[in-house]
Every structure is written in C-alpha cells, then in structure tokens.
C-alpha cells in the first residue's frame, strides 16, 4: 500500500520552470536579456521555499532558522532578504508548500484507487507505518499542528487554507457527498486521521504507536482489513 512518498511532493523544477516557455529561446532581444535575472530569482526563490518546507516538517517552526534554510538551499545567508521581507513570510510560504504537497499526495492516492474505495485507500496510506516514520516528507498538519497557535497570522492563514482543502477532498469521497452531514463527517475523519498520526509519532512504544493508528483506521473504515 502506498504511503506518502517523496516523488509526490511538489516539484520545484516544474513550478519554477513553468514560466520559462513564455518567450522562445531563439529570441535574444533586450526584453529577453532583461528578464533573465527575474527568472533566475524565481528559481532561487523556489529552492528556498522547498528547503523551508522540508525543514518545518523535520524540525518544526521553532527549529527552522534562516541561516540553515539558506545553507540547505545552497545559498548564502545574506541573500535571504532579496526574497522575503521576514522569516515569517518565508514560513508562510513554506507552510503553504508543505500543505499543498500533502493535499497533492492525497489526491494522487485517491486518483489511483477504485472510485468506491478511494477513502479506504487514502486512510490506509495516511495511517500507514511508513507515514508515521516519514515526518519530513509526510503530512505537514500532523507535523506542525501543535506549534500553530503560536505562529504569525500569515503562517496560520497558509496552513488553514490547506487544511480546508484536505477536508474538502475527504468530503468528496464520502457516500453522502453533497449533503450537509458529509462536511461534518469529513471534519471528524480528518481530525481523527491527523490526531492518530500525531499520537502514533509521539509515543516511544512501538506497540502503542501501531495500536493507535490501527484503531483509528478500523474506526474510520472497518472494512479495510
């Protein structure tokens, strides 16, 4: 069963390179030359955001420093403020990037599943032993939710937007999709998924960790076994 693999994370080259095709490479007029620094800056910006998105999942918001991020991105500390007005602005983009990766991964798992089993596939992947172990490449909400109340408004806003997307994605997999109770079911499902993952990662008892995630899985989708 698939977990949350690194290959489904947002691809920096794809994002940063999306605008490179707007002007054919055969045009070398002044406009083309003037745009090169802007494009180079955009690519560098994406590298920083990707490094920060990995770091916040690995070390948390409090453990993510500007110097370490720039080093991880292969850049000097002094260039940071050419891309962000503050550390909080970087964290907001990182939270958005990490949250988007989790939603994209979930959507990919659902797309690969038979329609009638899409939620089961997602639950089994999300609550897998592999996902418990893979904090750096896993769900950003589970990795960071305990720190969220202490973050700047722009960071919380970015994270909240992606949480809402996950809730909506889950709601669309429910048999009652389109009815008022589907949204409530989705809220309970996502809260249980995330809470079980947080606890399974928190404890130092392997048996308890397995019991937590399996209990949540059986509660949310009893027919998966």
Task: Name each region found by the language model.
Residues 152-161, 173-225:
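Hydrophobic/aromatic-rich alpha-helical bundle segments in the mid-to-C-terminal region
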Residues 78:
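Key DNA-contact positions within bacterial/archaeal DNA-binding proteins
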């Amino acid at each position: 069963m698939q977990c949350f693999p690194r290959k489904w994370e947002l691809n920096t080259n794809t994002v940063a390179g999306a605008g490179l095709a707007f002007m054919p490479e055969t045009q070398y007029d002044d406009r083309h030359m003037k745009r090169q620094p802007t494009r180079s800056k955009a690519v560098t910006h994406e590298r920083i955001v990707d490094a920060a998105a990995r770091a916040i999942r690995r070390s948390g918001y409090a453990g993510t420093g500007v110097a370490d991020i720039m080093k991880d991105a292969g850049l000097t500390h002094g260039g940071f403020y050419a891309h962000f007005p503050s550390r909080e602005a970087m964290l907001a983009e990182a939270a958005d990037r990490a949250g988007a990766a989790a939603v994209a991964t979930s959507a990919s798992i659902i797309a690969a599943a038979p329609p009638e089993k899409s939620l089961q596939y997602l639950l089994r992947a999300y609550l897998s032993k592999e996902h418990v172990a893979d904090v750096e490449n896993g769900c950003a909400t589970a990795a960071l939710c305990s720190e969220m109340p202490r973050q700047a408004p722009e960071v919380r806003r970015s994270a909240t937007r992606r949480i809402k997307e996950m809730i909506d994605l889950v709601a669309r997999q429910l048999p009652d999709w389109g009815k008022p109770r589907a949204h409530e079911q989705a809220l309970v499902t996502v809260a249980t998924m995330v809470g079980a993952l947080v606890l399974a990662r928190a404890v130092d008892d392997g048996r308890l960790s397995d019991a937590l995630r399996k209990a949540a899985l059986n509660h949310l989708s009893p027919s998966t076994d």
